[in-house]
């Protein structure tokens, strides 16, 4: 009712200035995203610094997301899970239409990414889909691999970020307990690619941005 009482010129004052400010701000954000490679450590912690030194040959989540962006089709539907890897990824994909991004939101259901992208593909079988999850969250719903590999199910792409830990919980631990943590590490020898193969799906391990971009492109093409 209130909107009906507004004139057709309501909000015209400085409208173009506001548009210009929004465009300038968004452009600055995009430039910042392209320059960020790693996360900074919280005061009093050295977690990220030690990880970069120990595993200098591995992609950071931000590098991985830039590689993913480069390989994603324009009309893709994506889903994300909870955790640091997917939270960082919220800043990267852009969409021209609605109903393209499935996310657990504030409900925080661990294991959401995999089953939600399966549902998206069943609902939109001709549209390429990509699900994302960290290795911790994926462990909650990975049993769905034994179902989705059946011949009557449409193919999907599922990306698993491997940092061998419950990263969000580890961060909470080191912040609250003087850089100490317990019960957050995952088995580095476990291969989700091999589990996928055992379930009848195709498993691919990538270690570089170039490999990741190519794998995304190929997997989406093979969904058709």
Language-model features and meaning:
Residues 18-19, 37, 55, 91, ...:
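Alpha-helical interaction segments
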Residues 3-6, 10, 33, 72:
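Hydrophobic residues within well-ordered, non-membrane alpha-helices that form the packing/core
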Residues 27-124:
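Active-site diphosphate/adenylate-binding microenvironment
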């Amino acid at each position: 009712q209130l909107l009906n009482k507004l004139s057709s010129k309501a909000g015209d004052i400085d409208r173009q200035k506001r548009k210009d400010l929004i465009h300038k701000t968004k452009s600055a954000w995009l430039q910042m995203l392209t320059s960020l490679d790693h996360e900074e450590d919280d005061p009093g912690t050295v977690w990220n610094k030690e990880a970069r030194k120990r595993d200098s040959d591995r992609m950071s989540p931000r590098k991985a997301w830039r590689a993913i962006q480069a390989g994603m089709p324009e009309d893709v539907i994506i889903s994300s899970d909870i955790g640091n890897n997917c939270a960082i990824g919220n800043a990267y994909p852009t969409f021209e239409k609605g109903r393209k991004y499935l996310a657990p939101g504030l409900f925080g259901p661990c294991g959401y990414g995999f089953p939600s992208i399966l549902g998206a593909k069943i609902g939109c079988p001709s549209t390429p889909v990509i699900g994302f999850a960290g290795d911790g969250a994926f462990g909650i719903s990975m049993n769905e691999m034994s179902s989705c590999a059946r011949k009557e199910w449409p193919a999907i792409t599922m990306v698993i970020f491997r940092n061998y830990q419950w990263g969000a919980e580890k961060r909470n631990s080191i912040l609250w307990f003087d850089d100490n943590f317990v019960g957050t590490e995952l088995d580095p020898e476990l291969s989700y690619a091999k589990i996928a193969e055992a379930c009848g799906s195709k498993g691919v391990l990538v270690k570089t941005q170039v490999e990741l971009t190519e794998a995304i492109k190929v997997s989406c093409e093979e969904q058709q």
